[in-house]
Amino acid sequence: MKTGIIGLGAMGFPIAMHLHQAGHLACAWNRTHATAEALAAHCGNLEIAVSPAALAARCELILISVSADADLRQVIEAMLPTLTPGTIIVDTSTVSAATAHDVARQVAAQGAQFLDAPVSGGVEGAKNAALVMMVGGDAAALEKARATLHAIAQRIVHMGPSGSGQAAKAVNQIMAAGINQAVTEALAFAQAMQLPLDKVIEVVSGGAAGNWFLSHRGATMIRDSYPPGFKVALHHKDLAICKHMADEANLPLPITEMTLMHYKNLMEAGYGAEDISALFRLKKP
């Protein structure tokens, strides 16, 4: 399928590179034109669209990777006049399920299809084409796009109707908050007990409490280094979406609420662009 991508940020750029390497990418658009030009320098014959509407006019499959609900709505509004029937839009962003429902209806009115398909795996997953994709929307549309999407994702799971992908991603983000809290708190305790932290990470990683976050972030956080894989500010944004969804379901999320408060403190201290493992700053003795 002739494929285009909108959004070339920390996730979108490596996604675009893998689509190009697999022979799928025909067109790209990014709000910052210089980034699109940098992609074109890597990709040879890639067309840089002058607008989302121009990209929509020539692509059968459109991937979107943006930061927030408002960005997605703006891009969809811009594309609607030139969307052709049968076009499939795959949004890999993390937005609210309500926004996914709304834009899916707008796209369907043009005879096209919208899949909310947020991803997990962070920047490393995007760079290694090892993302996990959770998809809401029409199952048949997903099957049409699946071969292309496998260029960027190692696992693609259809979760149900429109909005289900974003609901599943909310589950992921809530769980990530709890893991971050547990790992940073445990390592702070280990430090207070004057244990060798490298050895703590080694031994715990091999047991029942071992997890991806400890294995991939432990070594850097104990050296007070927090290069962004998943930025504090972005997880804060995602958890705010989760809390809103939970409030509507009358479900308390105490760990999520605590994490929102901690992230707010980090952001106010100037650490919003650091990795979420920077939570260790607030925990260590």
Residue ranges and their predicted role:
Residues 1-64, 87, 123:
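NAD(P)+-binding Rossmann beta1-loop-alpha1 motif at the extreme N-terminus of oxidoreductases
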